[in-house]
């Protein structure tokens, strides 16, 4: 009997590495969010190794990489790269199709996508960059956890 196959998405951003593995029913099999502290290769390797220990060695995983730091990793691992705004849009359309608007805050920028009769996407300018890092700084200042 063939093993179940999964899809995986890796987002290598300016401050974090995120990995999600899902089955054909869109159920999350594995998920990790880790700060890379500018050591993208080591953090990516840790997250991927951890995922591999949780999966059967015979499991087939179709993997796509995105994010501002993902293009180098995709090239290194010879995996498909997709631009992050496109990745976010496709994911929202697939998993939560009733969505009207999606806002994505990253470490370097913010993006907003309006869904409807026609798709409209906008991204902030460089003068407003670091939105995710700003949220982290404010959480530290307020002595709270930005991950909650």
Where are these regions (language model features)?
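Short glycine-rich, Thr/Ser-proximal phosphate-binding strand/loop in the N-terminal lobe
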Residues: 4-42, 46, 121, 125
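Short glycine-aspartate micro-motif
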Residues: 7-11, 62-64, 98-104
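A short acidic Gly-Thr/Ser loop motif
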Residues: 11-15, 67-68, 105-109, 131
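Short beta-strand scaffold segments in enzyme catalytic cores
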Residues: 17-22, 109-115
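Short beta-strand-loop/turn "lid" adjacent to the catalytic site in phosphate-handling enzymes
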Residues: 33-36, 52-86, 113-122
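Active-site cofactor/substrate anionic-group-binding motifs, chiefly glycine-
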Residues: 84-102
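Glycine-rich phosphate-binding loop plus the immediately following alpha-helix
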Residues: 117-148
């Amino acid at each position: 009997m063939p093993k179940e196959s999964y899809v995986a998405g890796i987002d290598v951003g300016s401050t974090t590495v995120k990995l999600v593995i899902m089955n054909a029913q869109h159920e999350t099999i594995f998920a990790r969010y880790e700060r890379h502290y500018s050591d993208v290769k080591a953090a990516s390797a840790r997250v991927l190794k951890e995922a591999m220990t949780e999966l059967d060695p015979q499991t087939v995983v179709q993997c796509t990489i995105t994010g501002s730091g993902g293009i180098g990793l995709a090239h290194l691992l010879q995996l498909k790269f997709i631009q992050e705004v496109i990745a976010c849009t496709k994911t929202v359309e697939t998993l939560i199709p009733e969505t009207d608007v999606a806002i994505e805050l990253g470490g370097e920028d913010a993006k907003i996508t309006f869904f409807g009769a026609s798709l409209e996407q906008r991204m902030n300018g460089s003068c407003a960059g670091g939105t995710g890092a700003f949220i982290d700084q404010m959480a530290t200042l307020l002595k709270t956890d930005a991950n909650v």
